């Protein structure tokens, strides 16, 4: 059996990726999120496939088909809420995974990091299109507002929006194509995850010290398979608690009202995991400026390898940079809160200040602090 594991062309790939993979002996629980994201992706694909078997992508029946899934399909409510809350878990883990990368300097693996940022964009696009599918009020108006942002693109904007809509407003054509894209994108994400892992296994994993760990590596199995399984059980426990006790905790009550183009909800807002970007978008009074800030708020992650000025890779031994990172985390939490608030004083001001702070910390304060720490260490 051992020989087959090491010699069979297909099993050999799995062996080198998950069994005999040399792994640093000191990686902490922060390195669990990669496997948890993989588990989330599998859950989303399975539950999504089961939902797609009962869902109809038509404006007249979409809302009713979701109701039918919850009421008449065996454990349909469980599948639907597992899919909706699974998306929330996905984003929680994504943000933790990115945060870990920033803290421990994992972005110095440039190829792995950049494919990860592209993955983030793809997952965000998939989640946005999935939110449109139940065809509730927030689905419809969210789709209208977010797709309309593309009209800010000079010259081709308005044509591009109509092209995406498949008409002169968000309608049947829009819903059908969003369903098609929402169905196919997770498989593209899976392929991209494989590329992400391919690049990662070229360099090997980073570790909390940020030092080269070639002299101290252990096999992935059984040490980290057990660790990943314990993380997975903890995740499933949390997810099931959320689904069974408060499935609508992270959702919007407006989405239980069927889409009505003639009636605008008082506060149009996306799901909680997009609120920080939505707050940055709203904090700029100019439409094009807002769209650029929105895109750049995530695209800025690609600049991290270039903005790394420290002689040390990880933040483990850099207390000043640690303080800045936690201020950045608090800024993002403030932005998330602001994104869910109405557009009025004092929320507008807080949002603008938090947005400025977000960009300043990443572009100016973090590199400057790194240089200062180098000086303090006489490097």
Curated annotation (Swiss-Prot):
Which residues, by range, are in coiled-coil regions?
none
What is the annotated localization of this protein?
A: Mitochondrion inner membrane
Gene3D superfamilies to which the protein is assigned, alphabetical = Cytochrome Bc1 Complex, Chain C
Record's GO cellular component terms = mitochondrial inner membrane; respiratory chain complex III
Q: Biological process (GO) annotations? A: mitochondrial electron transport, ubiquinol to cytochrome c
List residues binding heme b b566. 97, 196
**Binding note for cofactor:** Binds 2 heme b groups non-covalently.
UniProt keywords (A-Z) are: Electron transport, Heme, Iron, Membrane, Metal-binding, Mitochondrion, Mitochondrion inner membrane, Respiratory chain, Transmembrane, Transmembrane helix, Transport, Ubiquinone
What cofactor requirement does the entry state? heme b
What one GO molecular function would you report for this record? Answer: ubiquinol-cytochrome-c reductase activity
For binding a ubiquinone, which residues are annotated in this chain's numbering? 201
Write down the InterPro entries for this protein, in alphabetical order.
Cyt_b/b6_C, Cyt_b/b6_C_sf, Cyt_b/b6_N, Cytb/b6-like_sf, Cytochrome_b, Cytochrome_b_C_euk/bac, Cytochrome_b_N_euk/bac, Di-haem_cyt_TM
Q: What is the membrane topology here? A: Multi-pass membrane protein
Membrane-spanning ranges: 33-53, 77-98, 113-133, 178-198, 226-246, 288-308, 320-340, 347-367
Binding residues for heme b b562? 83, 182
* One matching Pfam family: Cytochrom_B_C
Other comments?
Answer: Heme 1 (or BL or b562) is low-potential and absorbs at about 562 nm, and heme 2 (or BH or b566) is high-potential and absorbs at about 566 nm.
Q: How does it assemble?
A: The cytochrome bc1 complex contains 11 subunits: 3 respiratory subunits (MT-CYB, CYC1 and UQCRFS1), 2 core proteins (UQCRC1 and UQCRC2) and 6 low-molecular weight proteins (UQCRH/QCR6, UQCRB/QCR7, UQCRQ/QCR8, UQCR10/QCR9, UQCR11/QCR10 and a cleavage product of UQCRFS1). This cytochrome bc1 complex then forms a dimer.
Q: Which PANTHER family match?
A: CYTOCHROME B (PTHR19271:SF16)
Question: In UniProt terms, what function does this protein have?
Answer: Component of the ubiquinol-cytochrome c reductase complex (complex III or cytochrome b-c1 complex) that is part of the mitochondrial respiratory chain. The b-c1 complex mediates electron transfer from ubiquinol to cytochrome c. Contributes to the generation of a proton gradient across the mitochondrial membrane that is then used for ATP synthesis.
Task: Tell me which family the UniProt entry assigns to this protein.
Answer: Belongs to the cytochrome b family.
Q: What is this protein called?
A: Cytochrome b
Q: Give me the gene this protein comes from.
A: MT-CYB
């Amino acid at each position: 059996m051992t020989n087959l594991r090491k010699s069979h062309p297909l099993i050999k790939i799995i062996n080198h990726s998950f069994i005999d993979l040399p792994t640093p002996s000191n990686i902490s629980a922060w390195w669990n999120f990669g496997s948890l994201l993989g588990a989330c992706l599998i859950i989303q694909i399975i539950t999504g496939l089961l939902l797609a078997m009962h869902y109809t992508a038509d404006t007249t029946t979409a809302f009713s088909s979701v109701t039918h899934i919850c009421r008449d399909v065996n454990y349909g409510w469980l599948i639907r809420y597992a899919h909706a809350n699974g998306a929330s878990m996905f984003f929680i883990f994504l943000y933790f995974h990115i945060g870990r990368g920033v803290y421990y300097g994992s972005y110095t693996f440039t190829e792995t990091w950049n494919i990860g940022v592209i993955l983030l964009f793809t997952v965000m696009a998939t989640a946005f299109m999935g939110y449109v599918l139940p065809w509730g009020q927030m689905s419809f108006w969210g789709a209208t507002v977010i797709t309309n942002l593309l009209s800010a693109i000079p010259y081709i904007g308005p044509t591009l929006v109509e092209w995406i809509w498949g008409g002169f407003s968000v309608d049947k054509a829009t819903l059908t194509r969003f369903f098609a894209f929402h169905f196919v994108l997770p498989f593209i994400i899976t392929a991209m995850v494989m590329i992400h892992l391919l690049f990662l296994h070229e360099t090997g994993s980073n570790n909390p010290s940020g030092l080269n760990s070639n002299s101290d590596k252990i096999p992935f199995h059984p040490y980290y398979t057990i660790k990943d399984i314990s993380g997975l059980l903890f995740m499933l426990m949390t997810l099931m608690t959320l689904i069974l006790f408060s499935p609508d905790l992270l959702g919007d009550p407006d989405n239980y009202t069927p889409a009505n183009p003639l009636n605008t909800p008082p506060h149009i807002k996306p799901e909680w995991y997009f609120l920080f970007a939505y707050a940055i978008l709203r904090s700029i009074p100019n439409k094009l400026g807002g769209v650029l800030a929105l895109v750049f708020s995530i695209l800025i992650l690609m600049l991290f390898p270039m903005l790394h000025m420290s002689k040390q890779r990880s933040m483990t031994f850099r207390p000043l940079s640690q303080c800045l990172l936690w201020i950045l985390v608090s800024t993002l939490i403030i932005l998330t809160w602001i994104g869910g608030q109405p557009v009025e004083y004092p929320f507008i001001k807080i949002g603008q200040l938090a947005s400025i702070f977000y960009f300043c910390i990443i572009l100016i304060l973090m590199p400057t602090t790194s240089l200062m720490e180098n000086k303090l260490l006489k490097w």
